[in-house]
């Protein structure tokens, strides 16, 4: 296990010992500029990512960040929302919102069940041989009568439940 982990560290992209984009140091691979929207993924159980959602700010957003350093009572509700959106991608309500992925999953499940049913039907019609004649109801009745005539298992079995004098099942 340890050699495998060591090789994965050496052979991964970015070289050995060099931290990637998701490191806590904030360095990027290749030394280029970071994108304006980072790869932060805020979840309900870890809502505070290490990096802000938006890293490159325009003049209006920079002025808003400077205004943030002052008293928060001077900020309007819209400015507070804009500051929140600069720092975080989603609100808790948006994080907790149910997705419609279950519809896709159920659609795929029903599609494959339907496809399997079509394959089974096709096999019964075109692949499997016809049923043997011994499986018809008439032949089954004849087999039962033959077993009763031979008195198969007369102590506890089938013949013990048949009344041979009245020719009917015992009650």
From Swiss-Prot:
Quote the SUPFAM superfamilies the UniProt record gives: Mitochondrial cytochrome c oxidase subunit IV (SSF81406)
Question: Would you tell me the protein name for this molecule?
Answer: Cytochrome c oxidase subunit 4 isoform 2, mitochondrial
Give residue spans on the Mitochondrial matrix membrane side: 29-100
Family of this protein: Belongs to the cytochrome c oxidase IV family.
Organism whose genome encodes this protein: Homo sapiens (Human)
Q: What does this protein do?
A: Component of the cytochrome c oxidase, the last enzyme in the mitochondrial electron transport chain which drives oxidative phosphorylation. The respiratory chain contains 3 multisubunit complexes succinate dehydrogenase (complex II, CII), ubiquinol-cytochrome c oxidoreductase (cytochrome b-c1 complex, complex III, CIII) and cytochrome c oxidase (complex IV, CIV), that cooperate to transfer electrons derived from NADH and succinate to molecular oxygen, creating an electrochemical gradient over the inner membrane that drives transmembrane transport and the ATP synthase.
Q: In which tissues is it expressed?
A: Highly expressed in lung.
Q: Where are the transmembrane segments?
A: 101-126
